[in-house]
């Protein structure tokens, strides 16, 4: 079942070949993840930006982590609410995020949701699950030398941002550094409600 698969994946994370970084077109990956996200639920989907850069990442594992964040956003938000995702480069780091208008997480519970098999009280009431989703995301991001940032307000929604350093990645050419809709789209500096209309 799902629990066994999740535990196997976490066990594999200790292996040296857990990730296989390849030169990846981040804009293309962002658009592909966005397209796959559309099938996960009836929401107002919004692609905020796609970073026109290349990075040495494992696109399969990053897709897995990103879609886990999207699945969580769908699970903990209502039908037709907005779920947004995007990517950007800031200060030598690749940012890939998912934001929602869901139930949100109290500040004191953010560290709880980072623990394996743990979910907030509100999340437990809304749905079942293994409580391993964020552990898997954090494991994948950590294998890339990065971290998972969480910004949330109860009743307003959350923004989960995978932040990965680019120093080991190829430097984009000057023609690739421009981004589509990238200005002001990076969520780590915004509250979860910043994109609401």
Set out the residue ranges of the language-model regions.
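Short conserved segment of the HATPase_c
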Residues: 105-117
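Short beta-strand/loop element within the Bergerat-fold HATPase_c
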Residues: 80-92
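Short alpha-helical Gxxx[C/S/T] motif in the catalytic ATP-binding
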Residues: 133, 137
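Short helix-loop "hinge" at the ATP-lid/N-box region of the Bergerat-fold HATPase_c
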Residues: 73-74
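Conserved glycine-rich
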Residues: 145-146
């Amino acid at each position: 079942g799902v629990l066994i698969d999740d535990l196997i994946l976490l066990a594999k994370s200790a292996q040296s070949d857990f990730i296989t970084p390849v030169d990846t077109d981040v804009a293309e990956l962002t658009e592909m993840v966005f397209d796959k996200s559309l099938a996960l639920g009836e929401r107002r989907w919004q692609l905020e930006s796609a970073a026109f850069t290349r990075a040495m990442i494992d696109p399969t594992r990053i897709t897995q982590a990103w879609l886990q964040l999207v699945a969580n956003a769908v699970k903990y938000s209502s039908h037709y609410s907005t779920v947004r995702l995007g990517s950007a480069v800031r200060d030598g780091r690749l940012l890939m995020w998912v934001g929602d208008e869901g139930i949100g997480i109290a500040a004191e519970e953010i560290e709880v949701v980072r623990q394996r098999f743990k979910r907030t009280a509100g999340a437990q009431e809304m749905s079942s699950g293994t409580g391993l989703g964020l552990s898997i995301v954090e494991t994948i991001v950590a294998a890339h030398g990065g971290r998972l940032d969480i910004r949330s307000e109860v009743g307003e929604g959350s923004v989960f941002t995978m932040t990965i350093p680019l120093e080991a990645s190829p430097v984009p050419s000057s023609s690739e550094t421009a981004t589509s809709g990238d200005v002001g789209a990076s969520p780590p500096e915004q509250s979860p409600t910043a994109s609401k209309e």
